[in-house]
A protein has these predicted regions:
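NAD(P)+-binding Rossmann beta1-loop-alpha1 motif at the extreme N-terminus of oxidoreductases
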Residues: 1-48, 102
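Conserved structured core elements
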Residues: 8, 12, 16, 93, ...
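Structural motif
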Residues: 9, 17, 66, 84, ...
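Short, glycine/charged-enriched secondary-structure capping and boundary segments
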Residues: 21-24, 44-46, 94-98, 122-127, ...
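Short, flexible turn/loop "capping" segments at secondary-structure junctions
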Residues: 23-24, 75, 141-145
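General small-molecule cofactor/ligand-binding pocket signal
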Residues: 30, 64-66, 134
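Rossmann-like NAD(P)-binding element
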Residues: 34-41, 52-109, 115-120, 147-148
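Rossmann-fold dinucleotide-binding core
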Residues: 107-164
């Protein structure tokens, strides 16, 4: 599977770091948060960061910003949706419910969690949804760590997950 477009939900340290990393790989990213202003501030921090998060400052144009109320339809066009929100299972479950309702068929959905087991994250997902769900734990700072931990579940489509 080729990843051509990504949506990152949550524009904190990890979400913005993931967005910048994908941007460096020339993958267009939409960065969503509760308010568009929060996503804009995150994009500004990416642009001004020291040490730089971007290989080339012009790549910032590959990051589109928005909010989860007005711009959630961006999920429909994404090949991969990364959840990078606060470590609260109730919030994560609510977001997954919305993502799986809106995503295009076959799009990968992942969590950047480092502390919640995949069985808990995926407990409300259907067997079909679990095929496309995994944990993609990026390490901070994303650009410099060069490490991605992928935690799969027993239902994963391995060819798809291996494309990450």
């Amino acid at each position: 599977m080729e990843i051509k477009k990504v949506v990152v939900i949550g524009s904190g340290t990890m979400g913005s770091g993931i967005a910048a990393h994908l941007c460096n790989a020339n993958i267009p990213v939409t960065l969503l948060d509760l308010k568009t202003e929060i996503s804009k501030q995150a994009r500004d921090k990416i642009h001004k960061s020291r040490p730089p998060l971007l290989l080339d400052k012009s790549k910032i144009n590959n990051i589109k910003v928005g909010n989860i109320l007005d711009n959630f339809d961006e999920v429909k066009e994404a090949d991969w949706v990364v959840e990078a929100v606060v470590e609260r299972i109730d919030i994560k479950h609510d977001i997954y419910k919305k993502i799986f309702k809106e995503r295009k068929k076959g799009a990968i959905v992942s969590s950047n969690t480092s502390s919640i087991p995949i069985k808990i994250l995926s407990q409300h997902l259907s067997e079909e949804e679990k095929k496309d769900f995994c944990i993609t734990h990026f390490f901070n700072p994303v650009r410099y760590m060069g490490l991605l931990e992928i935690v799969k579940n027993e239902n994963n489509d391995l060819d798809k997950i291996n494309s990450l």
